[in-house]
Design a protein with these regions (language model features):
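Active-site cores that bind ATP or allylic diphosphates and position pyrophosphate for catalysis
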Residues: 2-108
């Protein structure tokens, strides 16, 4: 991934902190199952590693999340509301939990 993103001389700290941030998002809500697309499995595996190491040091504190993949292979990547690419905050084609019902319906 470092080569793919062309991080030659320096690697942004956000790149290294992202797995910790995602693990915090999952563990803060004590998620037992995490529905993800196949492309997100490495991130969830890292989360599971973080949980295991944390629990080894501090006792059984965090919940170890189970990866739940879609049963339909056609849904391995959730399409964005633009219908072009996978749903992503950075592409601006996602639905937020804070979106109003009318806005969500507008995207259907």
């Amino acid at each position: 991934e470092i080569k793919m993103r062309n991080f030659e001389a320096s690697i942004p700290v956000g790149f290294f902190c992202y797995p910790i941030s995602q693990a915090a998002d999952i563990t803060a809500f004590k998620a037992t199952e995490v529905p993800v697309g196949e492309d997100q499995m490495p991130m969830i595996e890292q989360c599971k590693e973080i949980v295991h190491k944390f629990n080894t040091v501090y006792g059984e504190t965090l919940t170890d999340p189970k990866i739940v993949l879609p049963s339909n292979k056609a849904c391995l990547r959730l399409p964005g509301i633009d219908g072009k690419a996978k749903m992503s905050k950075s592409l601006g084609n996602c639905i937020y939990l804070s979106d109003e019902e009318a806005d969500v319906k507008k995207t259907q």
